[in-house]
């Protein structure tokens, strides 16, 4: 537990040392194994290293039977100085196929957004993922939305994913996650569509 706290404090301190101008999107948690998750993402604009976004969040997952769970999430966008409450609804079939629906409300912009994700776990640690980001952008459906498709492989200590994002801001996307413990991890994500890099830390516990 002490190592988890130290890891979280180090990442949080680094986050606050960066400049704070860009937005940060979060697309992790579809297979969250624990009740609590603290996630600290730091997004860096590759064209302007001073353009950095920090938007940490905490979520609590409540299982409703074996196939369904609901996770209230509270996120704070440091750049906008705005709270972003969310509700995540997760449905799974035999712990192999997952669907995650995210309802997101930006309190400062007074906008409701919606994102839909799915993951299918294949044998030998392989997986395929899809995300429909901003399928509803607060004003219209399918306006400025992004479709992302990736394939990946999970090992005991790491997970790698790579794929492509189309429609708005198309480009190659890749993700590398290193498991510090079975439930806690560090992550690096590249998004060729937004020309950004994201570094993050997740702490998960019951």
Which stretches of residues belong to each language-model region?
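Outer-membrane beta-barrel biogenesis signature
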Residues: 20-38, 206
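Hydrophobic, lipid-facing positions within transmembrane beta-strands of outer-membrane proteins
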Residues: 38, 54-58, 83-87, 112-116, ...
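Outer-membrane beta-barrel "beta-signal"
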Residues: 90, 120, 149-153, 172-182, ...
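Bacterial N-terminal signal peptides that target proteins for export
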Residues: 1-9
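Bacterial N-terminal signal peptides
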Residues: 9-17
């Amino acid at each position: 537990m002490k190592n988890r706290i130290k890891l979280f404090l180090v990442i949080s301190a680094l986050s606050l040392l960066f400049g704070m101008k860009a937005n940060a999107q979060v697309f992790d948690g579809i297979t969250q194994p624990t009740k609590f998750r603290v996630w600290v993402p730091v997004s860096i604009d590759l064209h302007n290293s001073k353009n950095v976004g920090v938007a940490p969040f905490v979520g609590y997952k409540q299982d409703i039977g074996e196939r369904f769970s609901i996770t209230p999430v509270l996120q704070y966008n440091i750049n906008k100085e705005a709270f972003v409450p969310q509700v995540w609804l997760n449905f799974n079939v035999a712990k192999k196929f997952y669907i995650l629906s995210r309802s997101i409300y930006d309190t400062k912009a007074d906008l409701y957004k919606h994102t839909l994700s799915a993951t299918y776990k294949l044998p030998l640690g392989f997986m395929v993922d899809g995300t429909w980001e901003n399928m509803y952008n607060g004003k219209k459906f399918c306006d400025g939305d992004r479709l992302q498709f990736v394939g990946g492989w999970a090992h005991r200590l790491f997970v790698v994913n790579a794929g492509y994002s189309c429609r708005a801001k198309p480009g190659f996307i890749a993700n590398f996650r290193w498991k510090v413990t079975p439930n806690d991890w560090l992550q690096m994500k590249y998004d060729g569509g937004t020309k950004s890099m994201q570094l993050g830390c997740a702490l998960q516990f019951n």
